[in-house]
């Protein structure tokens, strides 16, 4: 890998983690971990796959930037993150990628129990 390529990858990686700061805490944690895993997993791929990988993550960063900007400007105060994948894009995925996408969707749509507070009449000893 050339120094220029490594610099581009690192810059994109940092930019994505920075954009994740706009996400709700549970999605930020999920997104950060997913990005770290994916970038680590693609460290040793060939040049063609590396270019596709970077292109997709650059698109993700651009979409997330726009959604974060729209969220800040929204008068309703509701943040809306994410997008639907067109069927033709899904058809390009390998089985392993479909499995990862399914796991990610399940994690992202889980009820957030991290911050839920339940009242208890008595302490449990």
Curated annotation (Swiss-Prot):
InterPro entries noted in UniProt: SDHAF3/Sdh7 (IPR008381)
Keywords attached to this entry: Chaperone, Mitochondrion, Transit peptide
Transit peptide start and end: 1-30
Tagged with keyword Coiled coil: no
A Pfam family it matches: Complex1_LYR_2
Subcellular location, principal: mitochondrion
Location within or outside the cell: Mitochondrion matrix
CC per GO annotation: mitochondrial intermembrane space; mitochondrial matrix
CDD domains noted in UniProt: Complex1_LYR_SDHAF3_LYRM10 (cd20270)
Gene Ontology biological-process entries: mitochondrial respiratory chain complex II assembly; succinate metabolic process
Protease in keyword set: no
Function: Plays an essential role in the assembly of succinate dehydrogenase (SDH), an enzyme complex (also referred to as respiratory complex II) that is a component of both the tricarboxylic acid (TCA) cycle and the mitochondrial electron transport chain, and which couples the oxidation of succinate to fumarate with the reduction of ubiquinone (coenzyme Q) to ubiquinol. Promotes maturation of the iron-sulfur protein subunit Sdhb of the SDH catalytic dimer, protecting it from the deleterious effects of oxidants. May act together with SDHAF1.
Family affiliation: Belongs to the complex I LYR family. SDHAF3 subfamily.
Oligomer status and interactors: Interacts with Sdhb within an Sdha-Sdhb subcomplex.
Name assigned to this protein: Succinate dehydrogenase assembly factor 3, mitochondrial
Organism phylogeny: Eukaryota, Metazoa, Chordata, Craniata, Vertebrata
